[in-house]
């Protein structure tokens, strides 16, 4: 689901990339929004909605939170757009937020999962990070069954309201 696009096909604000697998593989306990340090061509490529964060993860390096293994392909429109597509990218958070999340990761054995990359109303790129507890296989099956039941229930409610 992409955000609002301009005439040039670029996303002005809204969703640029989503990690649906992250919400399935982890029980998300808490979320926060963090800024991300990007170069110009990376932002343009991100605005085209070409990024992938399915295999991405966030971790601590030198007291800061970094996003690893996210894929932002090179922007084809420019000549000087040479950058590493899978380079680690620094996330911008307050010190207290960093301490809170790193403490939770070390205590509870949780993980920092990037859930999506989006552009806010001001056009700034943001990453939604979730503090996730890993799910076991039976938990995943339960989540699938619950989701299917909600879908079937909504379908039954819709169909029962029709007059034949």
Swiss-Prot record:
Localization, UniProt: Cytoplasm
Record bears the keyword Acetylation: no
GO cellular component, one term: cytosol
Single GO MF descriptor: RNA binding
Keyword Cytoplasm belongs to the record: yes
InterPro entries: SmpB (IPR023620), SsrA-bd_prot (IPR000037), SsrA-bd_prot_CS (IPR020081)
GO biological process: one example: trans-translation
Swiss-Prot/TrEMBL keywords: Cytoplasm, RNA-binding
PROSITE patterns, per the entry: SSRP
Similarity comment: Belongs to the SmpB family.
Function: Required for rescue of stalled ribosomes mediated by trans-translation. Binds to transfer-messenger RNA (tmRNA), required for stable association of tmRNA with ribosomes. tmRNA and SmpB together mimic tRNA shape, replacing the anticodon stem-loop with SmpB. tmRNA is encoded by the ssrA gene; the 2 termini fold to resemble tRNA(Ala) and it encodes a 'tag peptide', a short internal open reading frame. During trans-translation Ala-aminoacylated tmRNA acts like a tRNA, entering the A-site of stalled ribosomes, displacing the stalled mRNA.
Protein name: SsrA-binding protein
Protein source organism: Gluconobacter oxydans (strain 621H) (Gluconobacter suboxydans)
Gene: smpB
